[in-house]
Amino acid sequence: MVQTTEAKQVCRAASTVLFPELEFGVKPCGKYTREDFSEILSRIAFDQEFANTGGKTLQLDRDEHVDITATARNSLAKSLLYHLRNLSTDAITDQFDGVRDRVFEVLRSQRRLPAFVDVAIDLHEWRFYGSADTDHVLTTYPDLGTNKAFCFATLCIVAPRTRFTLAVVPMDANGFRAKRDAVRSLLETAKQYVSIRHVYLDRGFFQVHVVAELEQQDVEYIVRARPSSGMKDRLSVGAETVADEYTMQRKRKPTAAVDVTVFAVPHRTSEDEHVWFVTSLDVDSSTARAYAAAFRRRWGIETSYRQLGEFLPRTSSPTFSVRLFYFLFAVSLYNLWVLANVLASAETVPETPLISTRIFRRFVLSTDYG
């Protein structure tokens, strides 16, 4: 059981990791302050709202005069977006790197980091309804009325209640080169903070150059596979599992080849179907099910993505710096919510979060943004 006072303390302590790191390039003579921008960002993140609405509600709560029927953009929201549009990518990523550093300083000081962690790499698509020619917008599968999206590769810890997002890489393309480079960057960043035991990747990363990069990074991995006919031929009629040596290769330039173990287990819900993987681990038919079960833990990341979405502001902006800032701000708030629950849980990790996102919102919104 967590008392109100204790919950408030850990939530506000977590928030002090974030807000002092935020910089917007505000001039001393500006109409609005860094604290104003931090507060409106928090509101639109927790409420999943547009900046214009968030600016109006914030000023109404301050008893300031606001024309709620005005069609022109709210002045506070307009100023926030102006400053975000003028931030460089490096200026944005540097400050959120600082937030991550402080999160892990707290975890180390509290001795809450395990000796080794499993991690999952995945793609997070933020759907876009504007022009396909917009910078950083990729064409992807149709969903929610569009086939365009801003895309971010993420690396997360795979463990109940401690699913921190360790690294984020914006994607400028969706080919194998971009994915290979993203995997390299994510792993190199993650290794600065944790010791990696296994890396799990979904079928979107089942490409020989990506697997070759995993080998180069010297990490143990399991990748969900799209089975070729050569793979399927290894499964005997009536067999439930299979594990065998296999060579992934690309014969067209740029060529690549990687020796892996391929294994398959029965699909959990579809009869006569199997789920296929490639791995660097020593897997045989007797251990294939156990490794497939270990891979299923990465599916908990889907829950993390939904919870991350609870901190993502709404926007129709085509400007990449706005999207990047919003996404990294959401990741930071999500990580701080996880951190608050870690700090509130003493020595044990509960099955469900002690502090809900709604309670976290209430305590953070009442904090000092200085």
Show which residues each predicted segment covers:
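Short, solvent-exposed helix-loop connector elements
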Residues: 26-28, 286-295, 307-327, 344-348
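Electropositive, glycine- and tryptophan-enriched low-complexity nucleic-acid-binding patches
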Residues: 140-194, 275
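Domain-level cores of phosphate- or acyl-group-handling catalytic modules
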Residues: 176-232
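A short, flexible helix-boundary coil/loop motif
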Residues: 1-32, 41-48, 53-72, 172, ...
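Active-site-proximal, Lys/Arg-enriched surface segment
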Residues: 81-157
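An anionic, glycine-rich sequence signature occurring as long contiguous blocks
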Residues: 217-307
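Major-groove recognition helix of helix-turn-helix-like DNA-binding domains
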Residues: 66-89
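Short, conserved catalytic/metal-binding motifs centered on acidic residues
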Residues: 40, 54, 115-125, 155, ...
